[in-house]
Amino acid sequence: MPALILPLIEAAGHWPARGSLLGLDLGTKTIGVAVSDPDRRLATGIETVARKAFTADAQRLLALAAGRNACGFVLGLPLNMDGSEGPRVQSTRAFARNFARLTELPIGLWDERLSTAAVERELIANDVSRAKRAKIIDEHAAIYILQGALDRLATLNRAD
């Protein structure tokens, strides 16, 4: 059975109470990957996957998830500033649909507006060279996306 693809809050209801989540930042050339601790408090970068073909990319992501006993994925959804969906969102949703056929782990979609821009500003503020930024930007964006999702989930859990 294919994985569920839901907004983050709805997906959280399908994940066990504990277990790592993998955060993904889909770029056109690379996929940034981050992982949470099992208690879902802190996101840490794993790697930047150079995109090749969908099947190869998906197999790498599934191997990373299995190696960290992940129970779900958080996929950054690049909405436009006004909240509308453009071509990048359509591409992300298509990736999610295809990826869901290969796993049963629920996929949560999380608004990632300005994540790459925020990370870029932070790296520049820390005097990271342009060449180094290009190599790590997607992984850091995945950390930013996953940490934002973890923080939102923690807020919901406190409200319960």
From Swiss-Prot:
EC number: 3.1.-.-
Keyword annotations of the record: Cytoplasm, Hydrolase, Nuclease, Ribosome biogenesis
Superkingdom of origin: Bacteria
Gene Ontology CC terms: cytosol
Location relative to the cell: Cytoplasm
Disulfide bonds: none
GO terms (BP aspect): rRNA 5'-end processing
Pfam families the UniProt entry points to: RuvX
InterPro entries for this protein: RNaseH-like_sf (IPR012337), YqgF (IPR005227), YqgF/RNaseH-like_dom (IPR006641), YqgF/RNaseH-like_dom_sf (IPR037027)
Principal location listed in the UniProt entry: cytoplasm
Molecular functions per Gene Ontology: nuclease activity
Entry-linked CDD domains: YqgF
NCBIfam families: RNAse_H_YqgF
HAMAP family per the UniProt record, alphabetical: Nuclease_YqgF
Its job: Could be a nuclease involved in processing of the 5'-end of pre-16S rRNA.
Family, per entry: Belongs to the YqgF nuclease family.
Protein known as: Putative pre-16S rRNA nuclease
Organism of origin: Rhodopseudomonas palustris (strain HaA2)
